[in-house]
Swiss-Prot record:
The keyword Nucleotidyltransferase applies. The RNAP catalytic core consists of 2 alpha, 1 beta, 1 beta' and 1 omega subunit. When a sigma factor is associated with the core the holoenzyme is formed, which can initiate transcription. This is DNA-directed RNA polymerase subunit omega. Promotes RNA polymerase assembly. Latches the N- and C-terminal regions of the beta' subunit thereby facilitating its interaction with the beta and alpha subunits. It catalyses: RNA(n) + a ribonucleoside 5'-triphosphate = RNA(n+1) + diphosphate. Signal peptide: none annotated. It comes from Polaromonas naphthalenivorans (strain CJ2). It is an enzyme of class 2 (transferase). It comes from the Bacteria. Belongs to the RNA polymerase subunit omega family. Disulfide bonds: none annotated. Gene3D superfamilies: 3.90.940.10.
């Protein structure tokens, strides 16, 4: 199993704070039943980071956060 590192994700979302927000929101979506965009048997937080590192999810997650 390949390990996901913050550096892998920072290549896609350079700002650490935006990365955390995007990963958190995506993990919440996954835990509520949304379909994963990659094949994964991991917990929602790890799956969200894997999606970001793979380029399947990005800053568009922040535009979906309700005000």
């Amino acid at each position: 199993m390949a390990r996901i590192t913050v550096e892998d994700c920072l290549e896609k979302i350079p700002n650490r704070f935006q990365l955390v927000l995007a990963a958190t929101y995506r993990a919440r979506m996954l835990s509520q039943g949304h379909a994963a965009r990659i094949e994964s048997k991991n917990k929602p937080a790890v799956t969200a980071l894997r999606e970001i590192a793979a380029g399947k999810v990005g800053l568009e997650m922040l535009k979906k956060v309700p005000n």
